[in-house]
Curated annotation (Swiss-Prot):
Spans traversing the lipid bilayer: 29-49, 61-81, 118-138, 148-168, 180-202, 210-230, 255-275, 292-312, 321-341
Protein name: Glucose-6-phosphatase catalytic subunit 1
Gene: G6PC1
Entry membrane topology: Multi-pass membrane protein
Pfam families: PAP2
Length: 357
């Protein structure tokens, strides 16, 4: 088993080395792709846009992103996946030959296990939702039929082009092995396809959001404590990252498994608070919500304010404080874009709109 994994890892190292040597000019592109593929952009950019254009799509997108990343965390704890940037330096596989030279970058040194790839899984799930939802919206509305078929082909080609670039980016940056990004893409699609058959998420009560958030948190902590009780160190990757990352400042606490868990659960709970708030009912369920300028204003205001909000980083000196603030910060994102911002805009635009009617 170990020998087989060593061969698989060596293939990944050779792939990374090949990309870094032959595509040096593409370094900035691969870094950009990796940054864009970060799940944070699904919360801060894609969710506000889709929610105010097609509310149901926005809700499903966020659920797929959160549950997908939660499952990614559980998978990583089970699979114990290595990462190329530390494995190539830590293994004795190359004891009888020269160690391949692998470059590291500021976005390389993530601290969690490597399998499956979170970037690939998140991107696949989120973009699968967007493609299938877009096709569902335009199905029967675009005639003749061949135009819809052209749209279908274009969107799916775009989808796979995005997945290919994300996968190559993660391999190039020595953050993942090839088999890890493939597993991420397949897992992300599976999560998104599953949620296409779950309709209860669109009218879930605040109690249901609370119970699901509590269950996800309790399961993750319970699973962590169980494995720890069995002698399994689930934070083994943090030591690897701190030991083998070229620059200590490239190791960030916000890439640890618990940071990801708290951010995702905060986002889901914040969505529940927002969708069950009076501000949401007054602004997004009234006649004004059908007015295109109101929707566009909500999108623009959300993107601007969330961009400013994203620049505020919780202090990381004390881990517990960092995790609590990360949860609260993530909860504010959907709360602001779904209820607070539309409500404030409704107060400003409501009276002129009524007069025009």
């Amino acid at each position: 088993m170990e020998e087989g994994m060593n061969v698989l890892h060596d293939f990944g190292i050779q792939s990374t080395h090949y990309l870094q040597v032959n595509y040096q000019d593409s370094q900035d592109w691969f870094i950009l792709v990796s940054v864009i593929a970060d799940l944070r952009n699904a919360f801060y950019v894609l969710f506000p846009i889709w929610f105010h254009l097609q509310e149901a799509v926005g809700i499903k997108l966020l659920w797929v992103a959160v549950i997908g990343d939660w499952l990614n965390l559980v998978f990583k704890w089970i699979l114990f996946g290595q990462r190329p940037y530390w494995w190539v330096l830590d293994t004795d596989y190359y004891s009888n030959t020269s160690v391949p030279l692998i470059k590291q970058f500021p976005v390389t040194c993530e601290t969690g296990p490597g399998s499956p790839s979170g970037h690939a899984m998140g991107t696949a799930g989120v973009y699968y939702v967007m493609v299938t939802s877009t096709l569902s919206i335009f199905q029967g509305k675009i005639k003749p039929t061949y135009r819809f078929r052209c749209l279908n082909v274009i969107l799916w080609l775009g989808f796979w082009a995005v997945q290919l670039n994300v996968c190559l980016s993660r391999i190039y940056l020595a953050a993942h092995f090839p088999h890890q990004v493939v597993a991420g893409v397949l897992s992300g699609i599976a999560v998104a396809e599953t949620f296409s058959h779950i309709h209860s998420i669109y009218n879930a009560s605040l109690k249901k959001y609370f119970l699901i958030t509590f269950f996800l948190f309790s399961f993750a902590i319970g699973f962590y404590l169980l494995l720890k009780g069995l002698g399994v160190d689930l934070l083994w990757t943090l030591e690897k990252a701190q030991r083998w990352c070229e620059q200590p400042e490239w190791v960030h606490i916000d890439t640890t498994p618990f940071a990801s868990l708290l951010k995702n659960l905060g986002t889901l709970f914040g969505l529940g608070l927002a969708l069950n708030s009076s501000m949401y009912r007054e602004s997004c369920k009234g006649k004004l919500s059908k007015w295109l300028p109101f929707r566009l204003s909500s999108i623009v205001a959300s993107l601007v304010l969330l961009h400013v909000f994203d620049s505020l980083k919780p202090p990381s000196q004390v881990e517990l404080v960092f995790y609590v603030l990360s949860f609260c910060k993530s909860a504010v994102v959907p709360l602001a874009s779904v209820s607070v911002i539309p409500y404030c805009l409704a107060q400003v635009l409501g009276q002129p709109h009524k007069k025009s009617l």
